[in-house]
Curated annotation (Swiss-Prot):
UniProt entry tagged with the keyword Lipoprotein: yes
Topology class, membrane: Lipid-anchor; GPI-anchor
Lipidation residue positions, type GPI-anchor amidated serine: 129
Disulphide bridges: none
Name the UniProt record assigns to this protein: Uncharacterized protein C24B10.06
Organism (species): Schizosaccharomyces pombe (strain 972 / ATCC 24843)
Chain positions listed as propeptide in the UniProt record: 130-156
Keyword entries, A-Z: Cell membrane, Glycoprotein, GPI-anchor, Lipoprotein, Membrane, Signal
Signal peptide residues on this chain, from the entry's feature table: 1-22
GO cellular component, one term: external side of plasma membrane
Main location: membrane
Keyword flag Membrane: yes
Subcellular location: Cell membrane
Length: 156
């Protein structure tokens, strides 16, 4: 009896972790047409579309390859990667995601930054990722399969 209860607890924890990953990853809209997309935050649509300008430059920008520009709408983070080519600065939208006030998760690569409100409708704080963190649909599928395999191994 105890073995079955513990296996159910393990399976439930796998499902919780999988669900957490799924909620953290959900890009909104089409990255090809950023200016035409309205961003969603919880159950409401933000009143404005994604602004492509103005971009905010970091004061401590010293690297020519480090992402140092970002723009936000309310609690939504839009991260951009910056690169230099022949002395000309080029800004590429990399990704954007709903900001989760309880976490510092970002889908941006290492060195990318974004500004976001730590609490809705308050001041903004700097978020910077220290390492690449990406969860794709395929990685979620792997987590799902591992969950099922672990459950089957514990129950059988």
């Amino acid at each position: 009896m105890f073995g079955k209860v513990s296996s159910l607890l393990v399976f439930a924890s796998f499902l919780i972790i999988q669900g957490a990953f799924a909620t953290l990853v959900a890009p909104i809209g089409d990255l090809e047409h950023l200016s035409e997309i309205e961003l969603l935050y919880t159950n409401r649509v933000l009143p404005s579309k994604i602004p492509l300008t103005p971009f905010v430059k970091r004061d401590d920008d010293s690297s020519s390859t480090q992402a140092s520009y970002s723009t936000t709408v309310s609690d939504v983070v839009i991260v951009t990667d910056k690169s230099w080519s022949d002395g000309v600065e080029t800004i590429f939208p990399y990704s954007y995601t709903e900001y989760q006030p309880s976490t510092t998760y970002t889908s941006a690569p290492a060195g990318s930054i974004g500004y976001a409100a730590s609490i809705p409708n308050t001041g903004r704080e700097l978020m910077e990722s220290g390492s690449p963190v990406r969860f794709s649909k395929s990685s979620l599928l792997i987590v799902s399969l591992l969950s099922i395999a672990a459950f089957a191994a514990l129950v059988l």
